[in-house]
């Protein structure tokens, strides 16, 4: 690597550290010619697929747009920054793992909805309303009812319900 101070070709690594998330290596280097020290960052370069828009246009994947989508959906919601970042990373990971050169914007939207659903149901419905082009209140109601039907019942709830039914003289559902 060239020294940024004297442009000499020979530098040596004197220290290397891996970032907390394991995706970056920080290397401390020293120039063999002038003795100056500088740091470099080494990251994995993985090409993300090109996004094919609904109108047929193509554009490079932009993680900032993805983050903006999450931020808008979760605006003023009690979701930590770390959770949002993890959701963005999960979507990017899905795109990388697809192995495809192109991916439709609808699929990206589906990945976002999966992550939003895990984070915050209000944010999920906000995003779904734009993503699925809700036309009226009935569309909102339908999505909310679908979400409620698919929500898991707490593991402690069923035994309590069965016990209450048995106390009332009605057999439980076993």
Swiss-Prot record:
UniProt KW NADP keyword: no
GO MF annotations, alphabetized: ATP binding; DNA binding; zinc ion binding
Cofactor: Zn(2+)
Keywords noted in UniProt: ATP-binding, DNA-binding, Metal-binding, Nucleotide-binding, Repressor, Transcription, Transcription regulation, Zinc, Zinc-finger
Record text on cofactor binding: Binds 1 zinc ion.
UniProt entry tagged with the keyword ATP-binding: yes
InterPro entries: ATP-cone_dom (IPR005144), NrdR-like_N (IPR055173), RNR_NrdR-like (IPR003796)
Domain of life: Bacteria
HAMAP family tied to this protein: NrdR (MF_00440)
PANTHER family assigned: TRANSCRIPTIONAL REPRESSOR NRDR
Function text: Negatively regulates transcription of bacterial ribonucleotide reductase nrd genes and operons by binding to NrdR-boxes.
Protein name: Transcriptional repressor NrdR
Higher taxonomy: Bacteria, Pseudomonadati, Pseudomonadota, Gammaproteobacteria, Lysobacterales
Gene that specifies this protein: nrdR
């Amino acid at each position: 690597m060239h020294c940024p101070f004297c442009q000499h070709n020979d530098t040596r690594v004197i220290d290397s550290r891996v970032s907390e998330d394991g995706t970056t290596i920080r290397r401390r280097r020293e120039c063999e010619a002038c003795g100056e020290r500088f740091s470099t960052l080494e990251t994995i370069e993985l090409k993300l697929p090109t996004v094919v828009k609904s109108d047929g246009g193509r554009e490079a994947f932009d993680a900032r747009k993805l983050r903006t989508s999450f931020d808008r959906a979760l605006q003023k919601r009690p979701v930590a920054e770390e959770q949002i970042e993890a959701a963005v990373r999960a979507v990017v990971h899905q795109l990388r793992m697809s192995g495809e050169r192109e991916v439709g914007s609808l699929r990206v939207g589906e990945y976002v909805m999966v992550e939003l659903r895990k984070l915050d149901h209000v944010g999920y419905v906000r995003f779904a309303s734009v993503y699925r082009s809700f036309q009226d209140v009935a569309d909102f109601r339908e999505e909310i009812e679908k979400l409620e039907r698919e929500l898991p019942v707490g593991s402690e709830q069923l035994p309590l319900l069965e016990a209450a039914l048995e106390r009332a003289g009605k057999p439980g559902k076993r």
